[in-house]
Amino acid sequence: MSSINLNLIMAFSLALMGVLIYRSHLMSTLLCLEGMMLSLFILMALLISHFHMFSASMAPLILLVFSACEAGVGLALLVKTSNNYGNDYVQNLNLLQC
């Protein structure tokens, strides 16, 4: 395994650990999710170019589009939560409340 792939896997693992550790605030969770998606995007692009799989060259761009949609929905949820409750705690996002 090359050092670039190892670094990207470590970046993904650190972002995943950040999601698990800093899950009390929505903003920190969203930042860690963006780090995970960015490391997946770079890893997919490098693997596709390394193995010359040009038929799958649109996969990283599709992942990037879904990442942008996820960020937009997450930021809208962050704005709505901070307007309603005054903070960005994840514990305020209870689905049982109407």
From Swiss-Prot:
It is an enzyme of class 7 (translocase). Its main location: mitochondrion. Its EC number is 7.1.1.2. GO terms for cellular component: mitochondrial inner membrane; respiratory chain complex I. GO terms for molecular function: NADH dehydrogenase (ubiquinone) activity. Keywords: Electron transport, Membrane, Mitochondrion, Mitochondrion inner membrane, NAD, Respiratory chain, Translocase, Transmembrane, Transmembrane helix, Transport, Ubiquinone. It catalyses: a ubiquinone + NADH + 5 H(+)(in) = a ubiquinol + NAD(+) + 4 H(+)(out). It is found in: Mitochondrion inner membrane. One of its GO terms (biological process) is ATP synthesis coupled electron transport. The chain crosses the membrane at residues 1-21, 28-48, 59-79. It is a multi-pass membrane protein. InterPro entries: NADH_UbQ_OxRdtase_chain4L/K (IPR001133), NUOK/Mnh_C1-like (IPR039428). Core subunit of respiratory chain NADH dehydrogenase (Complex I) which is composed of 45 different subunits. Core subunit of the mitochondrial membrane respiratory chain NADH dehydrogenase (Complex I) which catalyzes electron transfer from NADH through the respiratory chain, using ubiquinone as an electron acceptor. Part of the enzyme membrane arm which is embedded in the lipid bilayer and involved in proton translocation. Belongs to the complex I subunit 4L family. This is NADH-ubiquinone oxidoreductase chain 4L. The gene is MT-ND4L.
